[in-house]
Amino acid sequence: MPRLLPALWLAVAALVLSGCGGYATTSDTFRRSLTQGKPDSALVAVNKAMEVPRAEDLPKSKTDTPLLLLERATILQAMGRHDLSSRDFEAADKQLEVLDFTSDTAGDLGKYLYSDDAQVYRAPPYEKLLVNTLNEVNYLVRGDLSGAKVEARRYLVNREYFANKEADERGLVALGSYLAGFAFEVDGDAQAAMRHYGDAYEEGGVPGLEGVVQRLAARTGAQDERLKPLLEALPTLPDDDAQQGELLVVVQVGMAPYRKPERLPIGAAVVYASQPGPGARLTPDQQNQANIFAAKGLLKWVNYPRLVRANRFDPPPTTLELNDAIPVAVPEALNVEVRVEEAFKRIEGGLIAAAVVRLITRAIAGEVTQAAARKASGSGGVGLLLGLIAEGTLTALDTPDTRSWVTLPARFDVYRARVPAGTHRVRVRTAGVTREATAQVAPGGWAVVNISDVR
């Protein structure tokens, strides 16, 4: 029996060293590369994570495939490869399951014995909605109104689904509705455009929406009951209005918050996971079990995903210079950073509750194994070590679910103007970096410019 002890101690040590960093580690390289303005390097890193050699290749099915497709689609968009970006967004959208903490119990959340990230990725509602929003941008930049309108309809279906689920996504969805309105407006369907603009207004609005709907109403007579406060006085259109066109510039700035592993003392975790709030919470029996094991010294820490800001400071305002004119501020249309933080706050208690439940499961496994081994071997030392191995196996393989869409921007800024037909030079300055693009606008036509590689 003494000869067995060193081998068992080695097994325990191996388990301690065998834990992995989870998605926070996997995503760190491409997240940092995009933050540094190196989307090419980010693409190499995300392809490596997907185990594919090129952006043209789709990965084999695995638990993180939908999320990695979202990451690559965002990176490809930053590189201006909008066709492949659309393909990845659509492939991810078909596979993406939506997170619903409203009906889960802590036991359901903890049923994956080894790790939260052992299950297929399930996205929070804001991620599902932003898939359609970003893909609308892809189609509009390419001049594909048919594709943009299809994406707008998908967006509408998802928006109505979450409205029926009473998901608190007001304000997040205004930008998607605004882009849908733009697509239908420039395609000549003024009444459908006005309905989408009405949705955007009802959901909190987008800067410049008032002027957009007033011009559309003056030009076409289209109306929406919800927009009446904005349509009481309509502008007089210039004589050459029909010869002008629409220019839309969408700028993505900064990086959204991401999750990283955090250790929380068991006492604080039990208190936090037991307080009333949305989502799963510990039952009185689970609280009692956790406190008993903590008193025995078997439970000390809980691993859970903490949300951290990617940007130490808020990204500075964006300015735009059109055809060498005086630079103007580009208004913020959507603050993703704030929305991510609000959504995470709603589920944080449930995440901690799930971590505590798994911790209890590990402690029970360790005690049962230790007792059985002590009885079979007559050695308390062997029983202790086997108990440590049983608990250690689950501990080493348990990584908090740090998965989230880390390449999302912190903010969307949107500029829109009625411009003469012709070629227009757009110079955007954000976060100390300048990007230039040209836009060709035909008489009565339109163009969309997207700047998304400065994070």
Model-derived features: positions:
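Boundary/linker segments of alpha-helical solenoid repeat arrays
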Residues: 54-62, 96-107, 161-169, 201-230
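TPR/TPR-like (Sel1-like) alpha-helical repeat modules
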Residues: 86-97, 153-157, 185-208
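Bacterial Sec signal peptide processing site at the extreme N-terminus
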Residues: 14-41, 50-53
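C-terminal soluble interaction/assembly domains
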Residues: 367, 371-455
